[in-house]
Amino acid sequence: MEQTIASVSLREIARWCAWLLTALLITTAVLTSFGRSCWACELLSHFPAQLALVALIPCVTFAVVGRRRDLVIAAVIAAWNVAALVPFYASVPTVLVPPPADARVIRVVAVNVAAENRDRARVIGFVRATRPDVLVVTELNDFWVRALDAVAADFPIRRLEPRDSHYGIALMSRLPLTILDDKPAGAHAVVARLPQPRLTIVGTHAFPPLSPQLLLRRNQEFAALAAFVRRQAEPVVLVGDLNSSSWSPAFRDLLRDAGLRDTRLGRGVQSTWPAWLPMVQIPIDHALVSPGVRVHGRFVGDRVGSDHLPVVLDFSVDAL
């Protein structure tokens, strides 16, 4: 009799713990929709993969204790999070065919080197190994200006804007492009234009939305970026650390308002931060393209001593 009571009690405890976890997951799903105006809700939107795994715990628990109705509810929550991942694995990629024979394939590499990082050998080694046509570096400071001297000869066109904060930025190019002074108002960005094929490249580093004030500034940056991209007569490639995942409501607004496409679609989530903790990594370093840009390859590079992983994008531009 005592064993039966203990068994029932343990089953009930497991059930109620599973329900508590399910309630937290439901609350999280609801709160993420308020990410445009609530910085904590914005942060909750970044983890559908991890939340899908967590949702398996109540699913298994309800199955074991024989609570079918509860299992259905928990399974719906798990499916909700899985659904956020499906476009990155099931969508048709930006392009399915190789570039035309007469098209030039351009490689852009974006790397947040981390201002405190001192592993110049790994960063320089990665740049030399990937041989980008255009290199965008964020969190540029005086140390990284000196470190990049090692590859300066490979990039005759350069704009380096170091800062003591985390918002220094650089654009370095092998291609005969022009660095523009015209750039998105209020955004940490560098802009270049290539005459042939006609193309605008934007490198940027957005504020992290870690307070109401920073959320507002980040949203203003996104609005400025969207307006700037819309003004361009030629195709646009926008790369950099946006401090926002692909599931953020504000990020989705940026894609919609700018007319850009997330190059992850059909190629996997390709998370980039934090570099040393794969189980909780989220994709906050981006490569976005406008119509007229055909993506032929996109991948995340190896660790370079930074808390971010670099992003590599190969593409061609349709003739205008």
Question: Where on the chain are the PLM-derived regions?
Answer:
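Membrane-embedded alpha-helical segments of integral membrane proteins
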Residues: 16-63
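Soluble catalytic domains of enzymes that build or remodel membrane lipids, polysaccharides, and related
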Residues: 104, 108, 114-128, 134-320
